[in-house]
């Protein structure tokens, strides 16, 4: 998720890009004049608006196709056997001029690894919105999550672009965006199979998180949806799907305000919902404004919910109760994991920005975030004996550097873990000014027990996207395996997929070279070959060839 831009040279400071956000009522011309540059030397007008996510290295890719046997530098271990699914925010038609970077159409890029060979396939998720706009060859949907700005003919359509995450569950590849329910996609062909694959489970929610969590010990998927009963409602549903996709738990709670609840964390018994300091407002939407506005008066808030009806409750808790806890105004962006301490408290780790990391959703007064805002990685502590609405203590800063997209060895999800992998900015290798995707030019491997951190530097004018972790074997020790991440080579205008052995983290053991640039992913996941049934080739296979006998050394007939 592209959120932070133009980092400074200090390891402790993270600057935010502050684009001009015009007032909703201001008319916008049908075409935009792009600044003169090498790509547009004649300063030609375009229906594509000038925006940070639609220019430079974030130029829309809009590609569908496949590449067999990508060029590999180095050697890929045969144990890496499966598919890296990633989804990009890639608008197919020129979007509404005032729309935001997180609302482009979902485009999947899949990389299948087998016996050291990597095949690639790209295809759009054919959402209802994508098909309507592709048929019309123009934008029909207006602002993000604001149907009042959509063309009247499509207001009854699902406006999800399914562009945020891809998760395999119950043998279904789910394309997710939290504004709606999942789309199901074929894991081999990438064809879109349908909307709401769990409809038969009877959960009366309009939404499904882009960050469901897998409990590897119970083989369950923990799900939530906010604004579950409609726009700007306070209703939040939490539920659990078993390995066959059957609902086994369901609990409804209320959010303290209509907050942006993007991510969560799970422990053995608890679900922690992370509320960002944005607020939805129906009246603002009806006037043509954005769904979200940052509120500097709101605290970062964490809703703690029992995962099951059978969850042992602390003293003072009632059956069906949830509690929320507050800190200061900030944005805990993505979680790594959470666990239950021996002291009875809950602990959760996340990346954190000390201001609004989505400046395209400013407060109603239009204020932009502080350009010197810090970013770091923090550990939060929750004492469940405290009443709802209590303020929690300041979190422990685990890594005091700009960072994002933390991942763990997810075989240990719900338990206290040792290793964290995440994108970081390495200032010793550059000033960060030439990077535009958060300036995150490296990866970190941090040990929570020893506090040791190892770094992988991607190179000058490169930026790194969200990492994934692949265990060396199903029973290997925690953190023993490989980390994989897409690296954008900004000057060359193309991308590489790097493979790093965690036993020697500072260098890649293999680089998969893409012959072109593709859009930055929002999120992605690794699906091992053993986790799917009947996996086919991702790309077109050659039929059996019979030798013709007409080669240069063969006699004339």
Curated annotation (Swiss-Prot):
Pfam families assigned to the protein according to its UniProt record, in alphabetical order: RPE65
Annotated residues for binding of Fe cation: 211, 262, 334, 523
Residues bound to trans-resveratrol: 144, 177, 404
Keyword Coiled coil appears in the UniProt entry: no
Free-text comment on the cofactor: Binds 1 Fe(2+) ion per subunit.
Keywords: Dioxygenase, Iron, Metal-binding, Oxidoreductase
Listed cofactors: Fe(2+)
EC number: 1.13.11.-
Coiled coil stretches, renumbered: none
Binding site for piceatannol: 144, 177, 404
Highest taxon in the source lineage: Eukaryota
Protein name in the entry: Resveratrol cleavage oxygenase 1
Species assigned in the record: Botryotinia fuckeliana (strain B05.10) (Noble rot fungus)
Organism placement in taxonomy: Eukaryota, Fungi, Dikarya, Ascomycota, Pezizomycotina
């Amino acid at each position: 998720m592209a959120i932070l831009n133009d980092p400074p040279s200090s390891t402790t400071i993270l600057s935010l890009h502050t684009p001009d956000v015009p007032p909703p009522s201001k008319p916008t011309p049908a075409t935009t004049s792009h600044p003169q540059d090498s790509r547009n030397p004649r300063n030609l007008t375009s229906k594509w608006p000038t925006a940070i996510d639609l220019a430079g290295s974030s130029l829309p890719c809009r590609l569908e196709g496949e590449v067999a046997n990508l060029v590999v530098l180095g050697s890929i271990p045969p144990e890496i056997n499966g598919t890296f699914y990633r989804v990009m925010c890639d608008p197919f038609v020129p979007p509404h001029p005032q729309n935001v970077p997180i609302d482009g159409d979902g485009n999947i890029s899949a990389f299948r690894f087998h016996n050291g060979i990597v095949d690639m396939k790209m295809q759009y998720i054919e959402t209802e919105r994508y098909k309507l706009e592709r048929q019309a060859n123009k934008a029909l949907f207006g602002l993000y999550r604001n149907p009042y700005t959509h063309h009247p003919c499509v207001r009854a359509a699902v406006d999800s672009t399914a562009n945020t995450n891809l998760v395999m569950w119950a043998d279904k590849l789910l394309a997710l965006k939290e504004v709606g329910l999942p789309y199901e996609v074929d894991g081999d062909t990438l064809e879109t199979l349908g909307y709401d694959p769990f409809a038969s489970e009877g959960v009366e929610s309009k939404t499904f998180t882009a960050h469901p969590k897998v409990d590897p010990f119970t083989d369950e998927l923990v799900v939530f949806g906010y604004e579950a009963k409609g726009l700007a409602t306070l209703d939040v549903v939490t539920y659990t799907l078993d390995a066959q996709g059957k609902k086994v738990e369901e609990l409804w709670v209320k959010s303290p305000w209509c907050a942006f609840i993007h991510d969560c964390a799970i422990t053995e018994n608890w679900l922690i919902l992370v509320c960002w300091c944005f607020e939805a407002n129906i009246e603002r939407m009806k006037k043509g404004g954005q769904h979200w506005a940052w509120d500097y008066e709101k605290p970062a808030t964490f809703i703690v919910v029992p995962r099951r009806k059978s969850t042992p409750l602390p003293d003072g808790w009632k059956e069906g109760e949830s509690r929320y806890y507050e800190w200061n105004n900030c944005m805990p962006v993505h979680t790594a994991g959470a666990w239950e301490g021996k002291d009875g408290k809950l602990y959760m780790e996340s990346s954190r920005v000390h201001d609004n990391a989505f400046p395209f959703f400013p407060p109603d007064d239009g204020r932009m975030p502080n350009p010197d805002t810090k970013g770091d990685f923090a550990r939060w502590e929750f004492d469940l004996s405290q009443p709802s609405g209590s303020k929690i203590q300041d979190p422990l800063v685990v890594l005091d550097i700009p960072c994002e997209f933390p991942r763990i060895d997810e075989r240990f999800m719900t338990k206290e873990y040792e290793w964290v992998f995440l994108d970081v900015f390495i200032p010793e290798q550059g000033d960060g000014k030439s990077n535009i995707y958060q300036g995150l030019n490296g990866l970190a491997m941090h040990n929570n027990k020893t506090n040791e951190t190892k770094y992988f530097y991607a190179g000058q004018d490169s930026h790194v996207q969200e990492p994934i972790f692949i265990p060396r074997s199903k029973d290997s020790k925690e953190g023993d395996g490989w980390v994989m991440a897409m690296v954008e080579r900004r000057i060359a205008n193309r991308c590489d997929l790097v493979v790093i052995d965690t036993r020697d983290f500072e260098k890649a053991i293999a680089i998969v070279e893409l012959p072109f640039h593709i859009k930055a992913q929002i999120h992605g996941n690794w699906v091992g070959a053993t986790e799917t049934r009947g996996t086919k080739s991702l790309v077109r296979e050659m039929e059996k060839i019979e030798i013709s006998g007409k080669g240069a050394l063969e006699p004339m007939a």
